[in-house]
């Protein structure tokens, strides 16, 4: 006989709701019976925040067409009982199902989400069968050029602002070789006069400001009101690729990936190293760090995100105090760690390098990133 879950006291439901930390646990609780939904509000992190904005596809011409700015939550998926011995993980976003074949689930006990994994048609998976870990979020532009095949993410940052006693927002966008800005009070795109001579590479918002990296290595801070730009470079500049990774609103990390042997005859990507810094906002400078604690930095596809290793699935192969690039050439990568012994006398120890404990195969990158982890014993051939 099925228990009548609707008879649970409201006081007990309120107590349960206060102890659910995972957004998918909340969704599962809401699926038990309809009367529970008032006690378990739908998680805000799964609600797709979106804004209709003027399209910029024909900039500087003004268009009456609209595009959509969406805030997408990024998750890491792993089957609790994988069929294969080699674990696979999927990194990607979850959005609302707006397809024509959208259907109501046949049972309130079925807590499912529609997923598109590599080399498969979209299908429903029961969330209870997966470990699902939130890794942050990103903003994407959709439908900005209906005639273009590349109508997805182009590089955008969103910043809510308080002005004239009301809630407004500012959007900074990387489009081709331009930086465009839109204020909600005006709803039109304007070109930003850049201080750097190079093209924009990446941009994030953090604590009320925009931070922008350029291809020549410049890093600038943009004030959202005046668009005044301030150079914010490390005290010891490196010829490197620079990546900005916010840790919520608590910290902003800078990862610089560089070749420690630029004069070598052969370019060896496996010997590239990283330097990691954290923003000291009060001092207005980058402070080098050698210990990320339990944090893991994911850099590459689906933006750059930071999470606690304690939230990652057991045996995932990525431990704390590490960096994982998901956009490495050749679809093979390793986590970067500090102080790795390579056995080569010329390799500096006090630096972030490949740790070959776990090899990460990047099986697919769209529509989600598929990662396959292999133990060191399985890839000794790479060290020869």
UniProtKB/Swiss-Prot annotation:
Q: Record's SMART domains?
A: FBOX
A GO cellular component entry from the record? cytoplasm
> Where, in residue numbers, are the Kelch repeats?
87-137, 259-309
Q: Which organism is it from?
A: Arabidopsis thaliana
Q: According to the lineage, what is the superkingdom? A: Eukaryota
Q: What is this protein called?
A: F-box/kelch-repeat protein At1g64840
Key words of the record:
Kelch repeat, Repeat
Q: Name one Pfam family in it.
A: Beta-prop_KIB1-4
- Residue ranges that the Swiss-Prot or TrEMBL entry lists as coiled coil: none
